[in-house]
Regions:
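Generic beta-strand/beta-sheet core signal
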Residues: 4, 164, 201-202, 224, ...
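Alpha-helical scaffolding within the catalytic cores
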Residues: 148-152, 208, 243-255, 336-342, ...
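Substrate-binding clefts and catalytic carboxylate motifs of secreted carbohydrate-active enzymes
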Residues: 9-11, 17, 27, 32-33, ...
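Short hydrophobic/aromatic-enriched beta-strand-loop microsegments
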Residues: 218-225, 351-357, 373-379
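The substrate-binding groove and active-site-proximal loops of carbohydrate-active enzymes
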Residues: 167-182, 190, 194-202, 227-245, ...
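Secreted/periplasmic carbohydrate-active enzymes, especially glycoside hydrolases
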Residues: 1-213, 217-221, 249-265, 322, ...
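Active-site-proximal loop/turn and secondary-structure-junction residues that shape catalytic pockets
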Residues: 147, 203-207, 225-227, 271-272, ...
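Conserved protein kinase catalytic core
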Residues: 170-171, 206, 230, 276-277, ...
Length: 482
């Protein structure tokens, strides 16, 4: 097998995406009777302190040359690898069959998965053809209940908690974009020590290793698929491939990730241009795209019709695709257009209203989107350089004043007193106060947990990485983290 990777067409992202094959690739060999790729779907339709009903749906494929009697044995093991439930099903399989086997098991006195005690069960699926074992497949399971409530916020296992999350790009600072599980684990350890309990995967499906760590360490994940749909943000970005690939990519994303207990919501897009009716959005350069993303406030509302737009219909389509594959979790999107002219919000399809920034618009949610839970899907965008403090400490710096204004400062540094932020953002203190004091806000995902390579706001070259992180590229904490 030979794979050629070409990343020469630039820019294709608004941050550093990395080059080459930077995640693990697995070549799996199987017997003629096997569990299909991402072939299990494990849910817990009924959960109480006394018992948990576990529904296991398994897709099994046969490439055998003759019909066989197939035994499907499913075992649930607890965190100590003790068997706590088992069930077997027998069915005839013919050559070429692809069958879905449904089973229900019960766990007595289940240990709940939580932020403080992320207990993991393992669902083991064993296949036997005419008495000979042909496959063994493992699926993670976390027993928990959760709810996003429009009035009272987020509940996990009946307990009200605030999601105190951060957004994370996939690079690892000086290590680059290549996956390194221990480096990811170190990042999560630093975040957890700081009090973080949530991760938003900005703005693409994450490495599977990240989700495995979040399962094990107890993080509340918002799993995001797209940064753009049909309308582009950079010259060579995913919009070139959206029409051909979005159905396959979204399907694969949900199938791959839906068994992770750390995932509590899906996001189908981040600040996509389809929020607005902008005919020229396909011809924007990166500076104009950022301007439109963060400062669009002059749309003629008379252009909005009473019927659903193509962009609203596309929103409904994407949400329905997710729901068909995983009806157990809510779907949201990161919206930086908070008014009711937003085509994604007009669709009515989003289960959770997610606002990127616009702190002063939070209180409008209950009026403009009644009955919908709310989360601050992206917040703050404060700027800081470790060890650099500009006096006086109670002064405020908004850098730059607007995206369409040039900005220079010879220090190439931002004050770390939590008194410097971008014009569409806010300080950490102001943001957290708003979230903490309002029960209806389920939580927040701060931009960003760690600094990342690329998008060196507010400076241009020779700056080469962001200033947004609560933690810098080396993993050192800034003033705002303590």
């Amino acid at each position: 097998i030979a794979v050629r990777v070409d990343n020469s067409e630039q820019p294709n992202s608004r941050w550093y995406s990395g080059c080459g094959i930077y995640r693990n690739v697995w070549l799996t060999t199987v017997e003629p009777l096997y569990v299909d790729l991402w072939g299990t779907y494990v849910t817990t339709p009924e959960v109480s302190e006394q018992k948990a009903t576990v529904s296991v749906s398994t897709t099994i494929k046969s490439e055998m040359t003759a019909e066989a009697s197939v035994k499907i044995e499913t075992i649930i093991r607890d965190g100590s690898q003790n068997s706590v439930s088992t069930q077997s099903t027998t069915q005839q399989f013919k050559p070429g069959d692809s069958n879905v086997i449904e089973q229900q098991l019960q766990i007595d006195n289940p240990v709940f998965w939580s932020v403080d005690n992320p207990h993991l069960y393992t669902v083991v699926t064993n296949l036997y053809a005419d008495g000979k074992q042909t496959d063994s497949y493992e699926t993670p399971l976390g027993v928990r209940t959760f709810e996003f409530d429009a009035e009272k916020g987020f509940f996990l296992n009946g307990e009200s908690i605030k999601i105190k999350g951060v957004c994370m790009h996939h690079d690892l600072g000086a290590l680059g974009a290549s996956i390194n599980t221990r480096a990811l684990e170190r990042q999560l350890e630093i975040l957890r020590e700081m009090g973080v309990n949530g991760i938003r995967t900005a703005h693409n499906p994450p490495a599977p290793e990240l989700l495995q760590l979040c399962d094990k360490m107890g993080f509340i994940v918002q799993d995001e698929t797209f940064d753009m749909w049909r309308k582009r943000k950079t010259t060579y970005d995913y919009s070139l491939y959206f029409n051909e690939w979005h159905e396959r990519d979204l399907t694969d994303h949900i199938l791959r990730d839906r068994n992770h207990p750390s995932i509590f919501s899906w996001s189908i897009g981040n600040e996509v241009m389809e929020q607005w009716t902008q005919a020229d959005a396909d011809t924007l350069d990166i500076m104009q795209a950022n301007l439109l993303l963060n400062f669009t406030r002059d749309i003629d509302e008379s252009e909005i019709s009473d019927t659903l737009s193509v962009n609203s219909l596309l929103t409904i389509k994407l949400v329905n695709m997710v729901k068909e594959l995983d009806p157990t979790r809510p779907v949201t999107a990161g919206n930086n257009e908070t008014r009711t002219i937003n085509h994604l919000l007009l669709s009515g399809a989003l289960d959770i209203i997610g606002f990127n920034y616009h702190l002063n618009d939070y209180d409008n949610v209950k009026v403009e989107y009644p009955g919908k839970p709310f989360i601050a899907s992206e917040t703050t965008s404060a700027l800081a350089t470790r060890g650099y403090y500009r006096m006086p400490s109670d002064s405020a710096y908004i850098w730059p004043a607007r995206w369409d204004m040039t900005f220079e400062d010879p220090s190439f540094s931002c004050s770390a007193y939590d008194n410097c932020h971008v014009p569409w953002g806010s300080t950490h203190e102001d943001t957290w106060r708003k979230v903490k004091e309002n029960d209806y806000v389920s939580g927040l995902y701060i931009w960003t947990g760690f600094d990342y390579i690329g998008e060196p706001t507010p400076f241009n070259f020779p700056a080469r990485s962001s200033y947004f992180g609560i933690i810098d590229l080396a993993g050192c904490l800034l003033y705002v983290s303590v």
